[in-house]
UniProtKB/Swiss-Prot annotation:
The keyword Secreted does not apply. The specificity (S) subunit of a type I restriction enzyme; this subunit dictates DNA sequence specificity. The M and S subunits together form a methyltransferase (MTase) that methylates two adenine residues of the sequence 5'-GAGN(7)ATGC-3'. In the presence of the R subunit the complex can also act as an endonuclease, binding to the same target sequence but cutting the DNA some distance from this site. Whether the DNA is cut or modified depends on the methylation state of the target sequence. When the target site is unmodified, the DNA is cut. CDD domains: RMtype1_S_EcoEI-TRD1-CR1_like, RMtype1_S_EcoKI-TRD2-CR2_like. One of its GO terms (molecular function) is DNA binding. Type I restriction and modification enzymes are complex, multifunctional systems which require ATP, S-adenosyl methionine and Mg(2+) as cofactors and, in addition to their endonucleolytic and methylase activities, are potent DNA-dependent ATPases. Belongs to the type-I restriction system S methylase family. This is Type I restriction enzyme EcoEI specificity subunit. InterPro entries: Restrct_endonuc_typeI_TRD, Restrct_endonuc_typeI_TRD_sf, Type-I_RE_S_subunit. The type I restriction/modification system is composed of three polypeptides R, M and S; the restriction enzyme has stoichiometry R(2)M(2)S(1) while the methyltransferase is M(2)S(1). Disulfide bonds: none annotated.
């Protein structure tokens, strides 16, 4: 099958096989990987090095003739003292050959055609040379690299040496698996040094096609075999030199190498175009979804909202076809909920103003009984803090008006592993608090040498808010609906409890994560850098909240749960369809190779 036909006949599979990577943090949608196009690139590369990308030409000089010339050149270089004489190389056995080669091809090793890990000779410490650390080495198929300029005296010791025309391969995980490999070009003075995590091959003959050799050490089969040969501990595994210099490489006639590289480059350009079209299409789709969903939250009244919803529901199957679009729908539902637009209002419901009066009376009584501390009165929510008009029966208030005592915990030095059971105390990590989700397993074991502080134990009904950490992890909130015993909050988590059972803790937790209250918390974050931000208890107490009647709170939560069930079913079907597309892309790849 011609590769162009392989691409065009199955364009729908290559472009629709998507994979979502989950990413933690408030408001983060999973990043989409174009899995099908990635598999297509790998397939083209694998076909290239197996002799299946371009047709063979019987008039091409066989690879064996070029290898003879390289061997003669090597002998001459040894005579001239330019390279050291090698021990006789072992022939590649039949068992070592991973697949059958076309006529005119030969199996070689890099040690046959190159000097491995050579040195450079520079005598002047003041001479400027290129310096190439690992971040300057790309994963691109063209072997591109960036460079810095250093003086030889600064870097002559403790680094890997290389020169223009050398081919280098990253040997450490995960750089090797990510195919970091390079052809050095344009080095200052023709020479350079860089990261010690490289194997370097200096080709013996100018007849060698460096780009073709590079394709081999980036091919999926080569990377897979290299990964299986790695040695060392986790996180520090490396591909040994013996693999780099001795693993069999398929070697075609020189003219075919040039045809392979040319065709490969053209097909990569096609893949680039396909990738760009897919990304543009995904972006356009997401923008369309967000624009249409914005019409719901921007609706001025119930009639306009109904019209806009009817317009969207006509195209439901077309609009909500990605995980990001379904997540956007969920966020819109939450936004409508806290604006009072999700459910119809009942004029017979007791207004929230009466609820707030009872809460205030209950608070006064608790202060008298010494169960909570008296707090300074909070100012009314100003008009500037009210971004929209509330439905009849709703009231603006502040978090501090409806809660009992607020506190934060403590952060003793703990063992990293979680507490195994309820007999052993643990301290919650901030990752226990996710948006609208409590994860009790995210804790650290309190050492036996430290006494627990039961006053910080988390209880059912507590609302938790992350107080300190990276910007995207501060102000994240959840309700503890149910928890095991003997888990304490850390000093990076604020905890509070509502005064009255007539206020839904689920609804308040929702407000903390979406809408006016969440926006206020976002604006209240402070810190010298985004990597370490804070929210104070005072700011949290002052956060405005749109409080509906009790009956509406319960109705809102019930409606959200119903909507979310539908969204989760949509997402489950989508994930199942995506998995099928991934399997199709894999099957197509296997069929083309075999």
């Amino acid at each position: 099958m011609a590769v162009e036909k392989l691409i065009t006949d199955h364009i729908d599979i290559w472009s629709s096989a998507l994979q979502t990577r989950s990413m933690a943090g408030r408001g983060s949608n999973g990043k989409i990987d174009l899995y099908g196009i990635k598999k297509l690139r790998e397939l083209i590369l694998e076909l290239a090095v197996r002799g299946k990308l371009v047709p063979q030409d019987p008039n091409d000089e066989p690879a064996s003739e070029l290898l003879k010339r390289i061997a003669a050149e090597k002998t001459e270089l040894v005579k001239q003292g330019k390279i050291k004489k090698q021990k006789p190389l072992l022939r590649i056995s039949e068992d070592e050959k991973p697949f059958e080669l076309p006529e005119g091809w030969e199996w070689i090793t890099l040690s046959e055609i190159a000097t491995i890990n050579p040195k450079i000779e520079v005598t002047d410490d003041e001479q400027e040379i290129s310096f190439v650390p690992m971040p300057c080495i790309s994963t691109r198929f063209d072997g591109a690299h960036d460079q810095e300029i250093k003086k030889w005296g600064e870097v002559k010791k403790g680094y890997t040496h290389f020169a223009d025309g050398d081919i280098a391969l990253a040997k450490i995980t995960p750089c090797f698996e990510n195919s970091k490999a390079v052809i050095f070009k344009g080095l200052k003075g023709g020479v350079g040094v860089g990261t010690t995590e490289l194997h370097v091959a200096r080709p013996i003959s100018s007849e060698l096609n460096l780009q073709y050799i590079l394709l081999n050490i980036k091919s999926p089969h080569y990377l897979s075999m290299g990964e299986s040969m790695m040695t060392g501990s986790a996180g520090q595994k490396r591909v040994p030199r013996s693999f780099f210099e001795n693993y069999p490489i398929p070697f075609p006639p020189n003219t075919e190498q040039a045809r392979i590289v040319g065709t490969f480059s053209k097909l990569m350009f096609l893949c680039d175009q396909l990738e760009q079209q897919s990304l543009t299409s995904l972006d356009a789709h997401q923008q369309l979804v967000e624009t249409l969903l914005a019409t719901l939250t921007d609706s001025q009244n119930a009639e306009e909202l109904a019209e806009n919803w009817a317009r969207i529901s006509q195209y439901f199957d077309t609009l909500f076809t990605t995980e990001a679009s379904i997540d956007a729908l969920k966020q819109t539902i939450l936004q409508l909920a806290v604006m009072g637009k999700l459910v119809s209002q009942d004029p017979n419901d007791e207004p929230a103003s009466e609820l707030l009066k009872r809460v205030e009376q209950e608070k006064v009584q608790l202060v008298k009984e010494g169960k909570i501390k008296k707090q300074k009165p909070l100012p009314p929510v100003s008009d500037d803090e009210k971004p929209f008009e509330l439905p009849i029966g709703w009231e603006w208030c502040r978090i501090g008006e409806i809660i009992a005592n607020m506190d934060a915990g403590w952060s003793p030095a703990c063992s990293p592993e979680p507490s195994p059971n309820e007999d052993i105390w643990g301290v919650l990590k901030t990752t226990a608090v996710q948006s609208l989700e409590y994860r009790e397993q995210e804790n650290k074991t309190l050492p036996n040498s430290k006494l627990p502080r039961p006053q910080y134990e988390v209880h059912d009904g507590d609302i938790l808010v992350t107080r300190a950490g990276p910007k995207n992890r501060v102000g994240v909130s959840c309700l503890v609906e149910k928890t095991r015993s003997k888990l304490m909050i850390s000093d990076k988590i604020i905890r509070f409890h509502l005064i009255s059972d007539d206020i839904s803790a689920k609804y308040i937790s929702l407000c903390l994560n979406r809408g006016v209250t969440a926006d206020y918390l976002e604006a209240s974050k402070s810190g010298m850098a985004e990597s370490q931000m804070n929210i104070s208890q005072e700011n949290l107490r002052s956060a405005p909240i749109a409080l509906p009647p009790t009956a509406i709170q319960l109705k809102v939560i019930s409606t959200i749960e119903d909507f979310f069930k539908v969204c989760d079913q949509l997402k489950s079907r989508l994930q199942s369809a995506q998995q099928t597309q991934l399997h199709l892309a894999d099957a197509l790849t296997d069929a083309a190779l075999n």
